[in-house]
């Protein structure tokens, strides 16, 4: 009797897990169709810039410094400017002082500087998954889209690097299960957060890549002392 009860309980858990998986897959398909319809109406030129790994669309505003090594060449820390909106255009969070002024969330005690995050070979959760995928994967661009923007000097296959600027239109499954909100002075428009299971638009600029952050910061401090002095004295 006890064994039968345990078997029934296990079967019930498997059934619940199967139902949850089917529900998630069903929602993903629905959201994909909804996001595609939104892109068709608002950004039809990006439909063929769809990235199958992650299910997002990309607009490349700047390919970046093609002499610089791509992020995906190595494991590194990435410094990147970042601003996020919902599909209605409301700013949810920003690292940019000009946008903070624009939406009335600017504070004098907030240091508006780029994010600084680790970007390894495997997704660790330190980045929004969609931004991680864009950094690590080769972006495939529609040849007609590339031809329509000769001033950007875009290749049809691009790996992000220093200077790259992109806009990502991401489904919620590569954004986060809990939605998005700004904090610590990086809030967007007052009263706006991104609810769970909602697409997210991210504008991102790659500012720098660093292999060893401590060594890099040490060099920056030394350079500041040498160049600006400011009464500072270096000690060995």
Residue ranges and their predicted role:
Residues 1-19:
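Sec-dependent bacterial lipoprotein signal peptides
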């Amino acid at each position: 009797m006890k064994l039968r009860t345990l078997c029934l309980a296990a079967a019930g858990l498997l059934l619940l897990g199967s139902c949850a998986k089917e529900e998630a897959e069903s929602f993903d398909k629905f959201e994909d169709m909804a996001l595609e319809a939104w892109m068709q109406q608002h950004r039809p030129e990006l439909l063929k810039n769809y990235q199958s790994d992650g299910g997002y669309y990309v607009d490349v505003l700047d390919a970046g410094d093609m002499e610089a090594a791509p992020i995906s060449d190595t494991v590194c820390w990435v410094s990147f400017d970042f601003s996020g909106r919902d599909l209605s255009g409301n700013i949810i969070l920003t690292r940019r002082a000009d946008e903070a002024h624009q939406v009335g969330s600017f504070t004098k005690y907030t240091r508006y500087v780029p994010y600084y995050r680790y970007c390894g070979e495997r997704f660790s959760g330190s980045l929004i998954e969609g931004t991680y995928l864009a950094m690590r994967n080769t972006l495939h661009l529609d040849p007609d889209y590339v031809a329509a923007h000769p001033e950007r000097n875009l290749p049809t296959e691009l790996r992000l690097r220093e200077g790259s600027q992109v806009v990502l239109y991401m489904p919620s499954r590569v954004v986060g299960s809990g939605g998005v909100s700004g904090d610590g002075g990086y809030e967007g428009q007052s009263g706006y957060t991104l609810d769970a299971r909602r697409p997210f638009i991210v504008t991102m600029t790659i500012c720098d890549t660093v292999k060893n952050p401590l060594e890099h910061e040490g060099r920056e401090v030394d350079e500041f002392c040498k160049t600006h002095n400011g009464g500072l004295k270096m000690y060995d």
